């Protein structure tokens, strides 16, 4: 009789950009991974006692979560979509972790200058009087995308390793591959089609659906992970701003702040009196603003008499309940 597993397991990428990105992301979310031996494929998260970290290839993480040998995993959204085609044994908990960004693109040689769009590619096929050949690591996503765009007779060549050389050696007419900066494409005389984007991808958090339903400890860990990850992601785009403002009362300061476009804060400013040696009433205002709006916020504070502006990073912003956890509960009821 097989012993029921009680250990909680999280799969993380074993190498590459997603390996570094996952460790950095978890550390910033307060869930640092402890891996004393770099050669080992196991680790722990001190903040989560009883949780075992397993380092795997991104594709194997999806398979392990699907099969239930691992409860949670961080992998690429592109890999997850490809490996779970027509499957519902796993589910995404957070689709955008903020790192590992790339797009899945239809890519053609620069030498076929007349091909700029998918429609052009269909005309090119007709002129060749034969089906086109597409090399890719994503046969399921590729098949569906090409079928939806009138290229149903394209021969899909499933390949591993470097795809950029395939058109040059006559192995394929075009490729479908992940693109982050586009530098590799230019170096190999390739370019993306204008309408050839198949998928936008980032690192994502996934979980085994049955484990969430049947094991309370897995559901409890899901909530903890989502609490810290979502709070970190929400905070990562914001800064905390303090400023001293002269005024008659907290209410008058608040009125001045609410007349501005940027500095209203999350629910509103926190305003408190400043004990100072100078004459007149001073108040300290504390607000949270989007990082991209920081300079606009400073200008607005100055316009209402603000001075001594101090800006600090925000580590977490916790809401009453994580939105992603509410979504998880709803999905499990479906």
Stretch-by-stretch model annotation:
Residues 60:
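Acidic/His-rich segments in extracytoplasmic proteins that coordinate ligands and/or metal ions
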Residues 68-69, 77:
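Aromatic- and charge-enriched surface segment that lines or borders ligand/interaction sites
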């Amino acid at each position: 009789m097989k012993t029921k597993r009680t250990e909680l397991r999280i799969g993380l990428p074993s190498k590459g950009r997603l390996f570094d990105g996952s460790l950095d992301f978890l550390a910033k979310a307060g869930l640092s991974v402890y891996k004393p031996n770099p050669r080992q494929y196991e680790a722990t998260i001190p903040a989560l006692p009883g949780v075992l970290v397993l380092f795997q290839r991104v594709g194997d993480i999806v398979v392990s979560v699907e099969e239930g040998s691992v409860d949670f995993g961080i992998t690429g959204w592109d890999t997850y979509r490809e490996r779970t085609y027509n499957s519902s044994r796993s589910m995404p908990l957070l689709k955008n972790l903020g790192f590992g960004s790339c797009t899945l693109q239809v890519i053609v040689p620069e030498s076929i200058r007349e091909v700029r769009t998918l429609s052009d590619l269909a005309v090119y096929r007709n002129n060749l009087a034969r089906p086109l050949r597409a090399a890719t690591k994503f046969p399921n996503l590729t098949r569906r995308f090409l079928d939806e765009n009138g290229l149903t007779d394209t021969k899909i060549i499933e390949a591993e390793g470097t795809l950029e050389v395939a058109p040059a050696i006559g192995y394929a007419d075009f490729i479908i591959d992940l693109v982050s900066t586009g530098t590799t494409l230019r170096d190999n005389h390739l370019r993306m089609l204008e309408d050839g984007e198949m998928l936008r991808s980032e690192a994502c958090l996934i979980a085994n659906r049955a484990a969430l339903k049947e094991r309370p400890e897995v559901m409890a860990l899901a909530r903890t992970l989502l609490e810290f990850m979502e709070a970190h992601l929400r905070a990562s785009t914001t800064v905390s701003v303090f400023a001293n403002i002269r005024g008659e009362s907290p209410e008058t300061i608040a009125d001045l702040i609410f007349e501005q476009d940027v500095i209203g804060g999350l629910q509103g400013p926190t305003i408190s009196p400043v004990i100072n040696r100078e004459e007149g009433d001073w108040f300290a205002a504390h607000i949270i603003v989007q990082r991209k709006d920081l300079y606009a916020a400073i200008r607005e504070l100055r316009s209402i008499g603000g001075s001594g502006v101090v800006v600090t990073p925000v580590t977490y912003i916790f809401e009453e309940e994580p939105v992603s956890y509410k979504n998880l509960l709803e999905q499990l009821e479906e």
